[in-house]
Amino acid sequence: MTARRAVPAVLAGLVLLCLLAGVAVTTLSVRVEGSSMAPTLRDGDRLLPVPGSAGEVHRFDLVLLRSRHQNALLVKRVVGLPGDRIAIVSTPDDPFQVLLQEQGRGPVRRVTARPWTDQARRTGNCCAADGTRSARPELRTVPAGAFFYLGDNPDLSDDSRAYGWGEIARVEGRVGLRGGLLPTSPDLGPAPVLETARGPGSPAPGPGP
């Protein structure tokens, strides 16, 4: 094949690959509905799960969780893992203080995320024994086989505060691609970080799970 003939063939191959990729994204992806994960994810975004990642959770990853409530597929962020102790302290001046003690040992640290700081305005403490909201903040232990999850837009997210602990067995995959972008792209923003807890908010220890 001459170079003149090779160029159209290569271009045709590239077009075919692009078409196949588009079909794959449309067929295999999950469409985001609503704004509970804004600004990280927006309504209409398409997500592709990591192959073979069903039943996996890693701290601060985004996961696709099949909820027992109306069998809905949720897209949320993993915050607490089995054995962790978790609480949310809510005050008028600081309504969304997410506190975490990894594996129930060591210091209680604050989980901070820019979307939470920018968007959280409503007050509400956590956690009750099942991981939902509570009248006062209490550190609760995440049970075996479960995890604590939140949306990046706290005021508009139905997450563990509403539904309780998530079941790892019902995780259908970790989010691996968004509209063809890798999850580490700056477009998705930085992951939450653990910082030294400051301020007067101090959750009660809680009786355990």
What are these regions (language model features)?
Residues 8-9, 28-35, 39-209:
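Soluble "head" domains of membrane/secretory-pathway proteins
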Residues 7-25:
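Hydrophobic membrane-insertion alpha-helices, especially the h-region
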Residues 1-3:
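N-terminal Lys/Arg-rich, disordered targeting/topogenic segments
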